[in-house]
Amino acid sequence: MDPGAALQRRAGGGGGLGAGSPALSGGQGRRRKQPPRPADFKLQVIIIGSRGVGKTSLMERFTDDTFCEACKSTVGVDFKIKTVELRGKKIRLQIWDTAGQERFNSITSAYYRSAKGIILVYDITKKETFDDLPKWMKMIDKYASEDAELLLVGNKLDCETDREITRQQGEKFAQQITGMRFCEASAKDNFNVDEIFLKLVDDILKKMPLDILRNELSNSILSLQPEPEIPPELPPPRPHVRCC
């Protein structure tokens, strides 16, 4: 449109935007907002690990792109939701952040069974959080689905000078667990955070049958019902053990 003509219309008195304006006549010129496309899938991911390893920081960096230097420890469970698009599908990702203290294990264990992906986090500057990994693997073996994708994350890479656990140690631990991936990250510096979640979701989608991925009306499609805030029933222990 000619800028001069636009200014002339604004300056004109008594009817520059009157009923005769072609842009507004009958409301035909208004562009209707298209409703957002609903998600094709809803996936649940849980983040586990010892207290203070940065589970909440990783979740909030991914969902809100924020970082809290002095976050309070999670009590029980917390969750956030983020929608991502991968492989031509819109995925509503429900991320559960679990408490690291043992006294909350009876609560948090109820969330394992419904999780399609599990992120196990330790702090590279605290050896005791790495030494706790076998304990967390027992929780996974006891309550999680055998199909759940596993990802081991060494967090706080921004504190490299205080490192107590080498990258090689993290890689070696992950290699002992069937199907477990490994990476290091920093929630503070926003390093590898998006990659953690997106790679995990991509691995989950890879394992889905092709007929489900192609059929948007499948049972895996996101329900528009309100999200449940009550944990599922505690599943029975399963005998299978992942560790080699």
From Swiss-Prot:
Residue numbers bearing the Phosphoserine modification: S21, S25, S106
Effect of substituting S106E: Phosphomimetic mutant. Loss of GDI1, GDI2, CHM and CHML binding
Residue segments, region Disordered: 1-37, 225-244
Principal cellular location given in the protein's record: membrane
Reaction catalysed by this enzyme: GTP + H2O = GDP + phosphate + H(+)
Pfam families: Ras (PF00071)
Cofactor requirements of the protein: Mg(2+)
Residues holding Mg(2+): T56, T74, D97
Lipid-binding residues (covalent, S-geranylgeranyl cysteine): C243, C244
Binding site for GDP: G52, G54, K55, T56, S57, N155, K156, D158, C159, A187, K188
Chain positions of motif Switch 2: 97-114
Pro residues: bias regions: 228-238
InterPro entries (alphabetical): P-loop_NTPase, Rab12, Small_GTP-bd, Small_GTPase, Small_GTPase_Rab
The enzyme's E.C. designation: 3.6.5.2
Motif Switch 1: where in chain: 65-79
Keywords: Acetylation, Autophagy, Cytoplasmic vesicle, Endosome, Golgi apparatus, GTP-binding, Hydrolase, Lipoprotein, Lysosome, Magnesium, Membrane, Metal-binding, Nucleotide-binding, Phosphoprotein, Prenylation, Protein transport, Transport
Residues where GTP binds: G52, V53, G54, K55, T56, S73, T74, G100, N155, K156, D158, S186, A187, K188
GO cellular component terms, semicolon-separated: autophagosome; cytosol; endosome; Golgi membrane; lysosomal membrane; lysosome; plasma membrane; recycling endosome membrane
Organism domain of life: Eukaryota
Mod. after translation: Phosphorylation of Ser-106 in the switch II region by LRRK2 prevents the association of RAB regulatory proteins, including CHM, CHML and RAB GDP dissociation inhibitors GDI1 and GDI2.
CDD domains attached to this UniProt entry: Rab12
Subunit structure and binding partners: Interacts with RABIF. Interacts with OPTN. Interacts with LRRK2; interaction facilitates phosphorylation of Ser-106. Interacts with GDI1, GDI2, CHM and CHML; these interactions are disrupted by phosphorylation on Ser-106. Interacts with RILPL1 and RILPL2; these interactions are dependent on phosphorylation of Ser-106.
Record's function text: The small GTPases Rab are key regulators of intracellular membrane trafficking, from the formation of transport vesicles to their fusion with membranes. Rabs cycle between an inactive GDP-bound form and an active GTP-bound form that is able to recruit to membranes different sets of downstream effectors directly responsible for vesicle formation, movement, tethering and fusion. RAB12 may play a role in protein transport from recycling endosomes to lysosomes regulating, for instance, the degradation of the transferrin receptor. Involved in autophagy.
The name this protein goes by in its record: Ras-related protein Rab-12
Source organism (scientific name): Homo sapiens (Human)
